[in-house]
Amino acid sequence: LDSASIVYGNNGDDSEKRGIIVSERTELIQAGNCIGSPVYFFFNLNTAHLTDASQMLNLDELARVAKKYGLSLRVTGAADSSTGTPVLNGSLSTLRADHIVAELEKRGIPIERIVKVSRGGIADHVPVEANRHTKVELFF
């Protein structure tokens, strides 16, 4: 992992090289080469407010590891499809992803290393409350 931070790190001022690196990261993320298990952050009904503020500790650790090893992150927002309309759930899933992205940026993760996805309303998990989440995955 230490060599990954050198290969993919943003050590120079060459903007063309940075563009290539960002492109390579995007390709790796799209290829699905996730490191470890995803981390889920759960939200209250119809809000972008976490169900429990202690979840921020997970964000602290994700940011620490991502910075240490020069990793990229995919942040995927979702809402439960059993409430709201497709349009509202699409907006809510975006707000939830935006919230987590903003918190990662506050912790020193450059926006160039974050890919944001919004899934809208989903029904993937039981109980239904489990669909009110944002998932964060780490990638080389």
Model region roles, listed by residue range:
Residues 1-73, 130, 139-140:
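Periplasmic peptidoglycan-binding/tethering modules of Gram-negative envelope proteins
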Residues 53, 78-140:
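Periplasmic OmpA-like peptidoglycan-binding domain that tethers envelope proteins to the cell wall
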